[in-house]
Every structure is written in structure tokens, then in C-alpha cells.
């Protein structure tokens, strides 16, 4: 049985407060996009699970892979046979696209459906939350306003980017998320929340729909700012970094012709948003 875990982008990301526990509260819109990995399982005649990862390399030991953490979380509640798991990575890691979190949540859904486990989406989302703050998003997989640590979701009725073209570029830059939060120059509520701005026409988002990480990370990594400007030069209605990076995305009315010389060393992907 095979599924295709998809990525997400952040539309705006406001870091609104630093908490007493050292973490930060955020306000951001999560939007699913059709950049996908492939995840397949089969029952195996053995005493333990086996995970094989292909495609884009990921910097994680097998036992640290979120797919394995998802299986272990389900095994604490249910008994099911050992599995052979094949994961083909197309979503780059360390990009702000939620690839690992998506893999974990799709694994939860896949095992549930494969073995007809008696657990609904709400219970599955609760398990997903124990794996990562944004993992529950991929259980419902619909556009939401994410608040608190990014795990409290408010639906966005009638909000859709369907029909727009999207381009993603990710340079070979690694950004440590904890360091990115530590380096923030702005922490606090802004005048308008992301879920209000996204209902405006997309070509009015520029300058309004802000990712707070850009202010601190762009001076440190000028290449990120250059790629964002390249997306605008290529005709983007809106362009931004997703999460704490290092992937950037642009939204276009038509299929864009990107500056190939500017992205020769980048991961790049384009599609129409369904």
C-alpha cells in the first residue's frame, strides 16, 4: 500500500511571543502543496520493522526518522505485524516545507488504514502531536491558521490558491531552527494577522504578509534575499521564505521561466496548485 506525503508552505509567519518555557508562539498559515514523497509499506516475516530511504539524502539515523517514531507511537496503542517501509524522498529536508512531519503523519494514516485500526483523525492528530508540533496539520491536510506553538489550528473557509502556479527553490544553505529563533529581530504581534491578509488578492500580499525570520536571516544569508528577488523578477505575485527556511517559494498566474543561472545549485520544483 502506497501513499504520497505532501509538503506545505507557510504563508506569513509572525513570531508573537517568547514563552516562559523558552519556546515561541507563532501565527502562520499552513497551506498544502503537491510536492510529494512516496511512502509504501508491506508486512514482513520478521520480528522488527525495516526502513529503506531513497531519493534526496536525509541527515538522520533510521531510529531518528519520524516515520519510525510514528510506527513506535502507534505500537504503544495497537498490535500489528512488523513492516517493510520504503520512503522515497523528493521533499528536501531542512527547508521549512514540513517533509519529515508529513512523512510521520502519513505513516500514521497509512498504518491505520492498512490494518483498519479503530482510531479516528482526532485521536491520530493527538498521536501526531507527540512527534512534532506541525505533524497534526498533515492529518487534516487543509489550509489552516496555525497558532500557539504551531499546533492549534483554525480552519480557513473558502480560502484557496487553486489554479496558481508555484515555484520552489532551495539553496544549499542549512539553517538551524533554534538559532533562527534566537536571532529574531522582531517578536510581537503585528497589526494584521496572516489569516486576514490571505483573503486579500495575492498580488497585494507583498509587504503585508511577512515572515519574521527573513529580517534576521537575509542579512546573514544574502543568497536567500537574492533568490526571493529573482522570484519577483520572474513574475511572482508573491514570494517568501517558508518557515525558517531555507526554501523560498513564489506564486504566479502562469508557469514561470526562472533565471536558470541563479539556481544551478538549488533544489527546484514547479507545479500548478490543485
UniProtKB/Swiss-Prot annotation:
Catalytic reaction(s) noted: 4-CDP-2-C-methyl-D-erythritol + ATP = 4-CDP-2-C-methyl-D-erythritol 2-phosphate + ADP + H(+)
GO term, biological process aspect, one: terpenoid biosynthetic process
Pfam families named in the record: GHMP_kinases_C, GHMP_kinases_N
Matching InterPro entries: GHMP_kinase_C_dom, GHMP_kinase_C_sf, GHMP_kinase_N_dom, IspE, Ribosomal_Su5_D2-typ_SF, Ribsml_uS5_D2-typ_fold_subgr
Enzyme class: transferase
EC number: 2.7.1.148
Active site (UniProt): 8, 134
GO molecular function: 4-(cytidine 5'-diphospho)-2-C-methyl-D-erythritol kinase activity; ATP binding
UniProt keyword list: ATP-binding, Isoprene biosynthesis, Kinase, Nucleotide-binding, Transferase
Binding site for ATP: 92-102
Entry keyword Chaperone: no
Recorded metabolic or biological pathway in which this protein acts: Isoprenoid biosynthesis; isopentenyl diphosphate biosynthesis via DXP pathway; isopentenyl diphosphate from 1-deoxy-D-xylulose 5-phosphate: step 3/6
Protein purpose: Catalyzes the phosphorylation of the position 2 hydroxy group of 4-diphosphocytidyl-2C-methyl-D-erythritol.
Family membership noted in the UniProt record: Belongs to the GHMP kinase family. IspE subfamily.
Annotated HAMAP family: IspE
Protein name: 4-diphosphocytidyl-2-C-methyl-D-erythritol kinase
Organism name: Porphyromonas gingivalis (strain ATCC 33277 / DSM 20709 / CIP 103683 / JCM 12257 / NCTC 11834 / 2561)
Gene that produces this protein: ispE
Amino acid at each position: 500500500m502506497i501513499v504520497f506525503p505532501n509538503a506545505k508552505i507557510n504563508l506569513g509567519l509572525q513570531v508573537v511571543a517568547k514563552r516562559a518555557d523558552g519556546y515561541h508562539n507563532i501565527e502562520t498559515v499552513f497551506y498544502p502543496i503537491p510536492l510529494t514523497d512516496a511512502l509504501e509499506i508491506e508486512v514482513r516475516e520478521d520480528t522488527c520493522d525495516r526502513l529503506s530511504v531513497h531519493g534526496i539524502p536525509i541527515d538522520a539515523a533510521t531510529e531518528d526518522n519520524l516515520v519510525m517514531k510514528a510506527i513506535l507511537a502507534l505500537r504503544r496503542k495497537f498490535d500489528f505485524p512488523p513492516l517493510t517501509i520504503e520512503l522515497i524522498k523528493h521533499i528536501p529536508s531542512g527547508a521549512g516545507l514540513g517533509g519529515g512531519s508529513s512523512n510521520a503523519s502519513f505513516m500514521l494514516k497509512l498504518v491505520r488504514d492498512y490494518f483498519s485500526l479503530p482510531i479516528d483523525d482526532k485521536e491520530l492528530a493527538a498521536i501526531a502531536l507527540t512527534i512534532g508540533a506541525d505533524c497534526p496539520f498533515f492529518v487534516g491536510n487543509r489550509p489552516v491558521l496555525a497558532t500557539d506553538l504551531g499546533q492549534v489550528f483554525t480552519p480557513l473557509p473558502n480560502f484557496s490558491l487553486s489554479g496558481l502556479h508555484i515555484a520552489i527553490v532551495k539553496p544549499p544553505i542549512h539553517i538551524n531552527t533554534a538559532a533562527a529563533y534566537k536571532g529574531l529581530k522582531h517578536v510581537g504581534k503585528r497589526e494584521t494577522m496572516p489569516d486576514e491578509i490571505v483573503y486579500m488578492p495575492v498580488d497585494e500580499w507583498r509587504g503585508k504578509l511577512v515572515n519574521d525570520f527573513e529580517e534576521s536571516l537575509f542579512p546573514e544569508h544574502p543568497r536567500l534575499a537574492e533568490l526571493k528577488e529573482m522570484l519577483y523578477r520572474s513574475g511572482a505575485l508573491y514570494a517568501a521564505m517558508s518557515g525558517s527556511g531555507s526554501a523560498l517559494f513564489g506564486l504566479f498566474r502562469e508557469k514561470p521561466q526562472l533565471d536558470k543561472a541563479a539556481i544551478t545549485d538549488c533544489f527546484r520544483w514547479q507545479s500548478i496548485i490543485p
